[in-house]
From Swiss-Prot:
GO terms for cellular component: Dsc E3 ubiquitin ligase complex; endomembrane system; nucleus. The keyword Nucleus applies. It comes from the Eukaryota. Keywords: Metal-binding, Nucleus, Repeat, Zinc, Zinc-finger. It holds the Pfam family zf-RING_2. The lineage of its organism: Eukaryota, Fungi, Dikarya, Ascomycota, Taphrinomycotina. GO terms for molecular function: ubiquitin protein ligase activity; zinc ion binding. A zinc finger (RING-type) spans 107-150, 687-736. This is Uncharacterized RING finger protein C2A9.04c. Residues 316-332 have a biased composition (Low complexity). PROSITE patterns: ZF_RING_2. InterPro entries: Znf_RING, Znf_RING/FYVE/PHD. Residues 1-17, 177-193, 252-263, 277-302, 333-344, 357-386, 563-586, 604-619, 652-661 have a biased composition (Polar residues).
Length: 741
């Protein structure tokens, strides 16, 4: 039990270093309210704070078509395995042939005639096979064998474990830097990042100044798009030449190496890394830490962030300064089972709260005195650190443009019950009305009474829980009678080369539903990805990524809020059943907020919700009968008339409080709804003599006492053909025919 507590404390303490006063103000800021004069440092807070999001676009410059990289060319694709290609000297051993020397003029690759021009010159390889020059050249750019017999030629291994250039452009609403923090201002100035930059103001100034100057809007948009670019340049790569005598082509020499893991023992409590470990860490060559995947690239990017403490400051980090992978310390209990590895899956990358995220939004960084990288069991954590004000961070990376099908997988990784990244169990409470968990994992019962005791019963339990966690971590929690909320910050990045064709409309997710009430602090985002005037990037790709990011961000927020509501209702069901017993009379109008699932926006109070299968039922479309614990107003599934028997009035028993999907359990058929395969009923009369083929749909009907209806002309024609008497014309012809039979 203590090990689990220390494990959670280690994750929570490792996330404390990214917070500061400006960071908390940014998370607590409400976009719908403006701070008045004299109240610049105060922000209105509510019972449940929204989740703070940030989204950015990553552009990775990769080689283009017909790429002929030399030995010192750094622009090689880092996401592909090393390629063995033929060297240029291998062409010296190839023999050009004329038409007289050829038995067949057809190229085995393109099936075109050879020797029509210089590009289709017939070329004979040392193995004896003949191909067109252009086809053979394209093949040997990525291969070192004959296309037919697979015999090798002199080749070189081309591949680079280093990323070429990484651009990260944030799209989110940014915050002004802390003007009082001179150290941060100097650091941002040295990195080319201005702390007083505000995208919305720059955009407004660009629109207003555009009337006076023609080049002013382009200059302002250029600042918006590229003023906050963080990039990484890759060192030169080298190609490994392999002679033709190599008899093991399946095991070539590759310059890709796995970063070594170095343990850094600590001298004692509150002690820093000694000089020997620091010097050995500085002497690490770049070949020891070459990230080969995007996950490793992020790890290297985090470990080399300029926001980290300088070398002369006492460092307690368990991350090496120039290594691209996570390293463990022998004196700590920090788990690394869920950390990204060198060969991790491409999508989605597992979020890790143990990694420091990049300071993309230019938020004020934490000072070295208030930074702690050690678990909560260590004693070098500052006493003035408040855990409740330290938001934790989750990093999510997508290769390409993620579809809506990827969101459930991301939510599962965030809400799984036993995961280290669980938003509900990460050593804190997401917001005060969530279910609290004690140290042994038991759920605290919630008071279901309608009196004011509900507001005073759950809060002290949460407060005591926070105080216990604070004592364990060595922090001080203010005793203000309320439970502080933990604000997770989720960074979502979209990775896509800018020169690829834009994704079609079929691949883009649908427009997000407009929601009412409190929005996220990053819901209002500017299109900061417009291309500059020099045309180094293609505009449609960047603009498309910006629009995609906004839609994905809004949809992700909606999916997360719906999932949180479902989790809250499911977690409150066992506590309610244990407190309520078999049956409790509870007024439906006075139910607890945890018993309701609200979906704001156009789904609320809408008649179309009943026809949707995947939407969560709202409190306006479901009424819970507390006496029998039965949902009596669930949407029905219509069945054919011959299937429904005498039990048409029965209703399916659906337990209250459970998040059962709509139309999951069939109930009684409604009289005004019909199965699509059932015979449609109609109030229009039907002629009983239509089988004779003389009916006119526009003719008038004649109704008889027996209930049959016949067209007037059909009746007259039948009577005339049978030579009936005038007194028998009023008889139904259908009944008369049945009597004769």
């Amino acid at each position: 039990m203590d090990s689990n507590t220390n494990e959670n404390n280690s994750h929570a303490s490792s996330n404390e270093r990214q917070s500061s006063e400006g960071h908390d103000d940014y998370l607590n800021r409400n976009p719908n309210s403006e701070a008045t004069e004299g109240e610049e440092g105060t922000h209105p807070t509510t019972g449940t704070q929204p989740v703070a999001f940030s989204i950015g676009t990553m552009f990775i410059i990769t080689p283009q078509a017909n790429f002929e990289g030399g030995e010192n060319d750094p622009f090689a694709n880092p996401f592909q395995p090393p390629v063995k290609r033929a060297v240029k000297e291998a062409w010296d051993s190839f023999e050009p042939l004329s038409n007289d020397q050829l038995m067949d003029l057809t190229c085995p690759i393109c099936y075109d005639d050879m020797n029509e021009n210089d590009e289709k010159q017939a070329t004979k390889m040392p193995c004896g096979h003949i191909f067109g020059k252009n086809c053979l050249q394209k093949w040997l750019e990525n291969h070192c064998t004959c296309p037919l017999c697979r015999k090798e030629v002199p080749h070189e291994t081309v591949g680079s474990a280093h990323p070429p250039i990484l651009f990260i452009i944030p799209h989110s609403h940014t915050l002004r830097g802390n003007q009082g923090n001179t150290a941060v201002s100097q650091e941002n100035a040295s990195n080319g990042v201005h702390s007083d930059f505000h995208p919305s103001e720059e955009l407004n100034n660009a629109n207003t100044d555009g009337r006076t100057g023609v080049d002013e809007p382009a200059r302002q948009l250029h600042r918006i798009a590229f003023n906050r670019i963080r990039f990484i340049l890759a060192p030169n790569r080298s190609a490994t030449n392999t002679p033709v005598e190599n008899t093991h082509p399946e095991n070539p020499d590759s310059n890709t190496s796995t970063p070594t893991t170095r343990s850094e023992p600590l001298a004692g409590e509150g002690a820093s890394i000694d000089a020997e470990n620091a010097s050995s860490r500085q002497e690490t060559t770049p070949s020891d830490s070459r990230p080969s995947t995007l996950t490793s690239l992020f790890n290297a990017f985090f470990s080399s962030m300029p926001d980290r403490p300088s070398s002369n400051e006492p460092m307690t980090s368990n991350l090496t300064s120039n290594s691209g992978s996570m390293t463990n310390s022998t004196s700590t209990d920090l788990p690394t089972s869920n950390l990204p590895s060198q060969n991790a899956p491409a999508r989605p990358v597992e979020p890790s709260p143990s990694i420091q995220p990049p300071n993309l939004l230019n938020l004020p960084t934490a000072s070295p005195e208030s930074t702690s990288w050690l678990p909560g069991s260590q004693t070098n954590i500052p006493a003035n650190t408040n855990r409740s004000e330290r938001p934790f961070t989750q990093l999510m990376t997508f290769h390409g443009l993620p579809s809506l099908a990827d969101l459930p997988a991301v939510l599962e990784s965030m809400f799984r019950p036993s995961g280290n990244n669980n938003l509900l169990n990460l050593n804190g409470i997401f917001h005060p009305d969530h279910n609290a968990q004690t140290e042994n994992g038991q759920t605290l019962p919630e008071n279901t009474d309608d009196t004011n005791s509900n507001a005073t019963s759950a809060v002290p339990n949460l407060q005591n829980l926070n105080q216990q966690n604070a004592v364990t971590m060595g922090t001080n929690t203010p005793n203000n009678g309320s439970s502080p909320a933990v604000h997770p910050v989720i960074h979502i990045y979209l990775s896509r080369p800018p020169l690829q064709p834009a994704v079609s409309e079929q691949e883009t997710p649908s427009e997000a539903v407009s929601r009412e009430g409190t929005r996220s602090t990053d819901a209002t985002m500017e299109d900061s990805s417009r291309p500059p005037s020099n045309g180094s990037f293609q505009g449609p790709g960047i603009t498309h990524l910006s629009e995609m990011g906004q839609r994905i961000l809004q949809r992700f927020q909606e999916e997360m809020e719906n999932r949180m509501n479902q989790t809250r209702s499911e977690s409150s069901t066992p506590a309610q059943q244990s407190a309520a017993g078999s049956s409790i009379n509870v007024d439906t109008a006075g139910r607890q907020p945890s018993d309701e699932i609200n979906i704001p926006g156009e789904y609320e109070n809408s008649s179309e919700v009943a026809g949707s299968r995947n939407q969560t039922p709202t409190h306006s479309s479901i009424a819970v009968d507390t006496l029998s614990n039965v949902a009596v107003d669930q949407p029905a599934i219509s069945t054919p008339s011959d299937v429904v028997g005498s039990d048409a009035g029965d209703t399916s028993k659906v337990s209250s409080g459970t998040s059962t999907p709509r139309m999951a359990a069939p109930i009684a058929r409604r009289s005004n709804r019909h199965h699509p395969y059932s015979r449609p009923s109609s109030t229009r009369p039907q002629c009983q003599l239509e089988d004779q083929g003389i009916c006119d749909p526009n003719d008038r009907f004649v109704h008889f006492e027996c209930g049959h209806s016949v067209h007037e002309r059909c009746q007259q024609s039948t009577s005339n053909s049978e030579n009936q008497m005038d007194e028998e014309i009023g008889e139904c012809p259908k009944c008369r025919n049945e009597e004769h039979k």
